[in-house]
Amino acid sequence: MKRRTVLQQIALFTGGLIIPLSSNSWVSKGLSKNPSQKKLIVVFLRGAIDGLNVVIPYQEDEYYNNRPNIAILPPNEPNGVLDLDGYFGLNPALKDLMPLWKKKQLTFIHGCGLENENRSHFEVQHYMENGTPGNLKNDEGWMNRLLGILSSKNPTQAVNIGSVTPEILRGSIPVANLPREKDNLQKLSTDIPIVNKLFNELYNGNDSLSLAYQEGQKARKIFIKEFENEMVESSKNAPSTSNFVQEVKKMAKLMSGEANTQLGFIDLGQWDTHINQSAQLNRLLMPLGEGLATLALELGNLFNDTTILVMSEFGRTVKENGNKGTDHGSGNLMWILGGNIKGGKFYGQWNTLEKKALFEGRDIPITTDFRQPISNILSTNFDLSPQLINQVFPNFNSKNSLNFISV
């Protein structure tokens, strides 16, 4: 068996930490000279969440005319929206986010999306994750390119919650995957002292494969130390912690602890609500809101240096369909949370829900390229120059700043 095959089997063993191996990784190509203490967490809602039932324009008659069965009632009505600014209201299932809105640590950007309109889940997720719309062949994620700029000798600098590296983090720079299930962080053969000793002796050199093995072992030790209590509970048949609230607690621990994680990614599915949307959305939004509020709380003072970005591939139709659901749309909300956010108000362009103002007479139009808010975050929080931002998002001309971050 080849050395590379052996290492890949170790690295990709489903029971432990996963570190993708690459001959182009930072262990062989050098480090950036742009260190930063700021942190970024991306939460991707796969399936296209209905942003119009997240932040509701309850003052518009067209909202209720188009959604007789699935509209959220105005404030002061049973299960009505939570008023935000006298015009928009928050879905009551997200009540846990209201304190962040009142503290001006939460904002929403209207009409975000992929400017070359596309309603294919696969293609739009691909473009949003690789950051190069129109290029289906590119399989390198924009967060991996960002990691290449920020990279330090830290094997847990970028962490994905999940066992498979998502496209947004794929690339030449190694990232760490933390399995969603606690019992997936079980012992590996390399945890057996005699086996560990043999592998340590075999891969103690300075070649790229040896360095990759060494960094993988270092990262695994950090993870085991950070989640020692959880691993003990798991051995006593503790329930799975794959739910979002528990996952964000792990992420906060990694960012504030020895792992010193700087970039984090979590994805959540089942947002494609074509049928009986109200019940589905309520079931999904409650743990999402609770989890985001928990993440802010668990980060503590570190929340001031952290930006949490919640995004989805596209929005949904303004008009409900015949199955009390909605279909694939265009513009959507981008959610941004953080201690240095100029929150408590909205950004982006909102027109109306009149048919003449909608894209193709049916969708919220895309008025803000999804890369624009991210570029603002990279510029302000990570102090990236336009040239470096262009490395993250090639061929994207960043327009006027949305100015939603305090310097």
Please tell me what each predicted stretch does.
Residues 1-299, 319, 333-407:
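Feature for exported/extracytoplasmic and membrane-associated proteins, marking the mature portion
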Residues 120-121, 322-328:
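Short glycine-biased active-site loop of nucleotidyltransferases that positions the nucleotide triphosphate
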Residues 292, 299-323:
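Metal-dependent active-site segment of extracytoplasmic phospho-/sulfohydrolases and closely related
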